[in-house]
Amino acid sequence: NEIKSMIDQFGIETVQAYMNHVQDNAEECIRNAITKLSEGKYEYELDNGEFIKVTIRIDKIKREATIDFTGTAEKNPFNYNAPMAVCHAVILYVFRTLVGNNIPLNEGCFKPLNIIIPNNSMINAKYPSAVIAGNTEVSQLTCNALFGALGVIAGSQATMNNFIWGR
């Protein structure tokens, strides 16, 4: 175990101090990126007429962002759902792309982000909801909605290269 060997060599206090520094650095990088953003909202319409809706509010004084998915479609009986962890991963990815520095992904990235994801929505689906499209289609649509709300969306083939099982 690499962490155990580092603790044995340097001591727990030193290892924890470096771990905290990595998280603090990531947090500061995200906060700096937030200061350059503008508030926005986006509604991504799905083929079935439902929406992934997101509003992003920026507090430039606190250097925090609120990402609010209120109004997003409820979970559906098909496989176009994702668990909340997928939504969190997408948020982490999007905000990480806005950072100009080379930082590792870690919990510090989330500290300046206030996330609101409605219960039982298609991006916070719980068992027994089908979620096979969650890691592909739904995650990409959520990503596009976030980039749209931030005003940095660019056209691409999105998930046109995927093969999906189920209905």
Where are these regions (language model features)?
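Short beta-strand elements
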Residues: 52-71
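Flexible, glycine/threonine-enriched loop-and-boundary segments that flank and lead into catalytic domains
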Residues: 36-58
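N-terminal leader/propeptide and maturation segments of large enzyme subunits in energy/redox metabolism
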Residues: 1-29, 145, 150
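Terminal presequence/propeptide segments associated with secretion/organelle targeting
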Residues: 8, 34-35, 72, 85-86, ...
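Electropositive phosphate-/nucleotide-binding environments in soluble metabolic enzymes
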Residues: 20-28, 85-89, 136, 140
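Hydrophobic core positions in small helical hairpin nucleic-acid-binding modules
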Residues: 78-79, 83, 92-167
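Phosphate/ATP-binding catalytic cores across multiple sugar-kinase/actin-like superfamilies
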Residues: 28-37
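Glycine- and acidic
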Residues: 4-17, 69-82, 125-132
